Amino acid sequence: MRVPLSWLREYVDLPATETGRDVQAKLISAGLEVETVEHLGADLKGPLVVGQVLTIEELEGFKKPIRFCTVNVGQANGTGEPQEIVCGARNFAVGDKVVVVLPGATLPGGFSISARKTYGKTSHGMICSSDELGMGDDGTHGIIVLPPETEVGKDAIELLELVDEVLDIAVTANRGDCLSIRGVARETAIAYGLPLRDPALLDVPGPNAYGYPVKIADPTGCDRFTARTVTGLSAEARSPIWLQRRLQKVGMRPISLAVDVTNYVMMELGQPLHAYDRSLVQGTIGVRRAQEGEKIVTLDGTERKLHAEDLVITDDRGPIGLAGVMGGANTEIADHDAAENGGNATSDVVIEAAHFDQVSIARTARRHKLSSEASRRFERGVDPQAAAAAAQRTVDLLVLLAGGTAEAGVTEISAPSAPHTISVPADHPDKVAGVEYGRETVVRRLQEVGCDVYGQDELIVTVPSWRPDLDDINDLAEEVIRLEGYENLPSTLPRPPAGRGLTSRQRLHRRVGRALAGAGYVEALNYPFVGEQVFDQLGLDADDPARRVVRLVNPLSDEEPALRTSLLPGLLAALRRNDGRGAHDLALFETGLVFHPRDEQRVAADLPVDRRPSEDDLAALDAALPDQPRHVAVVLAGAREQAGWWGKGRPADWADAVESARTVAREARAELGVRKGQYGPWHPGRCAELFVTVDGEERVVGHAGELHPRVLKTLGLPARTCAMELDLDALERVGDDIPQAPGISTFPVATQDVALVVDAFVPASEVEAALREGAGELLESIRLFDVYDNAEQLGEGRKSLAYALRFRAKDRTLTVDEASAARDAAVALAGERVGAVLRS
């Protein structure tokens, strides 16, 4: 919404020293988004005067028609002599009043005017068009021709209001009242604490039986319709300069007097209007829904096929306008140009000022891709009480400017409606803002926006008709807070109650993320949506529980209509994208929720919004949610350690995936078991099953290892890609939430290395478990540091596993014999359990 400061001053007595920037700051403080302040005529300098064309000499011999004119500018040139000017325009004649810029002046854009020789003549100035003066398009595309009564020599800068400031306001969807000068003036008056001269306060005659007949068939779509008639409009009447300039400043193009007046009143009061040529309207004006197959040619010359939900204005022939959007060409106003071309100029008009349903107008405008100034206002909300005043204002201007006669008949049809009232505690704004405003301030601010307020501790507030956005107590609180100034709200740090903070689940989530990042993994956050074809790509069995998914009612993509049951699809897709873009050495991780439908999945009930949900309501909502455990997963490909002068490096392998699971388990302070496994996407010979022990029973919580070559090929992944996925919530349940500080012994450690030869199919985890149990309580740690599988030295189907054993006693220094005895016991049990023998 463009708001000229000069127009704003008509309704608010702003201090003379206030600039557009000052008003901008005030309105921004009050909550309006004033984006820019345009300075019209900022670099314009006179003399710029009204002149009268005395003579015109046609110059010949040039590529385009050129005229040499003498123009009377009065005493503006200091001599009183006619001014000689060369001009190429053709839309003026001898006797016309024009705008003349004299030597020494500067036009917008820094264009300086001086006497210069051109086309064999000396031109002492220039006859101006609207574009050259920065006025925009006036529809003539030529020289400005002023009304005959304009005084010669008058200052054209003042006459044409060329110097002004225009505020450009981005009006939000809830503030339709600010799509008018009246609405912005009201906000300005409040911001400055000044009275408002409301242009809608007019003496409006009441409805009677003599008005133009109107019938409303759809009172839901149109709850108010005012019709007024003006006859005897002069065919020669044109929009005065001040009206044209105001329309240009707000961004509209002058068209004809009747149309310009309706546009002017719309910009002034915010009420869209439409003028029909009375001679072209046949019978009763009606408001109804369109019928299938009906068509209308709108004012832009486009034939439109109507939809059954379109609200239309009709006469006895059919549609004559798209209600609230655009009028029809079959009742269009004909101006003086039509009369000059042999047609009949409109002399009698019917003025429509109506109130239409917001949703209906918005849908019609979008359906026909036809956004207009009228539809923009109806979509955001128009004051239904302004229709009669807007119609009266239009009638008054047409009578004043076009010499018309206002007929006595007044048609006004309105559906009964009660004003909207809200009961609000007087201290509610205080509670919302955390500031003690007091009852007097709350009442004063609400009255300033137009509310009627009664009551003491409990206020009964009647909302003004122009503010349909004020719907509940929080809207009223917002009005008080914004008018008191958002910048005056104190900045205070939140003070949570003692004992609050992150939950144990949140702390574990963060610890795991930090640990994996420290181990060289990069976090990747993926969408939680999957397509069911991904389970086939991962090689899951037909009866695998992971195939049971929660489907979305309105998915973002038809290809991914379900919520994930595993983190791997998203992580593997991220790895594939990165690998395809040249990043081949990858280690990614993600912690996030997966979703499993419950056995008895319920549908969440629609809760009312006028009260806080009860505990039962919240419990019912929780029961309708799917199970959402938190998982952690990693994927690896390429080099795990880079090659360089320090060594050969090494590729990522299944052991890295298993180690990432152990890293997660350490952060959860849980005992994680590892054994040979086989599941879905993993290579059957290189898959580890991860488990925890709960009440003496082992429970599988994840898998780790190298992915199956078939899965890699199907998904387009690099060779030897490895992955791990764990149920993090399951680890949390068996873990110790209280961190245990490790005991620090003052006694030295005794290290013993053993290399055991076992069958190739024996998992290292089983060997390690036997060594731990056999070594007893003196064993502090065990680490596998070498795997060797030379058939010539070890025999066919055999491998060597080398472990570093660390022994330490809490109360003494171990002797060599004690450490050796513990080692021998460990080796003996490993031999008994898995057939391990010491490598010689």
UniProtKB/Swiss-Prot annotation:
Cofactor or coenzyme needed: Mg(2+)
Limits of the FDX-ACB domain: 745-839
Its EC number(s): 6.1.1.20
GO biological process: phenylalanyl-tRNA aminoacylation
Co-factor binding comment: Binds 2 magnesium ions per tetramer.
SMART domains: B3_4, B5, FDX-ACB
Family matches, as SUPFAM superfamilies: Anticodon-binding domain of PheRS, Class II aaRS and biotin synthetases, Nucleic acid-binding proteins, PheT/TilS domain, Putative DNA-binding domain
GO MF entries: ATP binding; magnesium ion binding; phenylalanine-tRNA ligase activity; tRNA binding
Occurrences of domain tRNA-binding (ranges): 42-157
InterPro entries: aa-tRNA-synth_II/BPL/LPL, B3/B4_tRNA-bd, DNA-bd_dom_put_sf, Fdx_antiC-bd, Fdx_antiC-bd_sf, NA-bd_OB-fold, Phe-tRNA-ligase_IIc_bsu, Phe-tRNA-ligase_IIc_bsu_bact
Keywords: Aminoacyl-tRNA synthetase, ATP-binding, Cytoplasm, Ligase, Magnesium, Metal-binding, Nucleotide-binding, Protein biosynthesis, RNA-binding, tRNA-binding
Subcellular location, record wording: Cytoplasm
Domain of life: Bacteria
B5 domain residues: 417-491
Reaction it catalyzes: tRNA(Phe) + L-phenylalanine + ATP = L-phenylalanyl-tRNA(Phe) + AMP + diphosphate + H(+)
Residues where Mg(2+) binds: 469, 475, 478-479
A single GO cellular-component term on record: phenylalanine-tRNA ligase complex
Pfam families associated with the record: B3_4, B5, FDX-ACB, tRNA_bind, tRNA_synthFbeta
Family: Belongs to the phenylalanyl-tRNA synthetase beta subunit family. Type 1 subfamily.
Subunit structure: Tetramer of two alpha and two beta subunits.
Name of protein: Phenylalanine--tRNA ligase beta subunit
Native organism: Streptomyces coelicolor (strain ATCC BAA-471 / A3(2) / M145)
